């Protein structure tokens, strides 16, 4: 599971998911990418599920680039505990994803394989996604 090695502060505030992504909005490493169309927190488990689904589809060959990292801790209080008495314990880590963010990229496979693998990976995520191709515009950047 992906998680930070060490953090300056153990717990964070939730924050808000306003606006579009500030960066990571074009295919940089692979030939095809999976782009988020909605804002969401993507958990480390969801990222791993999508990665495993793509690896299994490719069998051998192909390279997967994970462009998001779960660096935000989220907390949860135990069941049947009254409100108050401080913030809960860290339950896991999430990646904050905004619309337009390229989350996964693939290279070294045919277009049909890439499209199908990214479609399967998209079903593992809690948001709407679309598949994009690296364009001449992207290569110019």
UniProtKB/Swiss-Prot annotation:
InterPro entries: Ribosomal_uL16, Ribosomal_uL16_bact-type, Ribosomal_uL16_dom, Ribosomal_uL16_sf
Keyword Signal: no
Organism: Thermus thermophilus (strain ATCC BAA-163 / DSM 7039 / HB27)
Function recorded in the entry: Binds 23S rRNA and is also seen to make contacts with the A and possibly P site tRNAs.
Keywords: Ribonucleoprotein, Ribosomal protein, RNA-binding, rRNA-binding, tRNA-binding
Subunit description: Part of the 50S ribosomal subunit.
One GO BP annotation of this record: translation
Full protein name: Large ribosomal subunit protein uL16
């Amino acid at each position: 599971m992906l998680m930070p090695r060490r953090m300056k502060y153990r717990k964070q505030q939730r924050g808000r998911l306003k606006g579009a992504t500030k960066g990571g909005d074009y295919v940089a490493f692979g030939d095809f990418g999976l782009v988020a169309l909605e804002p969401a927190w993507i958990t480390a488990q969801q990222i791993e599920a999508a990665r495993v689904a793509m690896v299994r589809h490719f069998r051998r060959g192909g390279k997967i680039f994970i462009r998001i990292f779960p660096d935000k801790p989220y907390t949860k209080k135990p069941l049947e505990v009254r409100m108050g008495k401080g913030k809960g314990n860290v339950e896991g880590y999430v990646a904050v994803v905004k619309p337009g963010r390229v989350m996964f990229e693939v290279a070294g496979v045919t277009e049909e394989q890439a499209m199908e693998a990214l479609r399967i990976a998209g079903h593992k995520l809690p948001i709407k996604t679309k598949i994009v191709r690296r364009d001449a515009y992207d290569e110019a950047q």
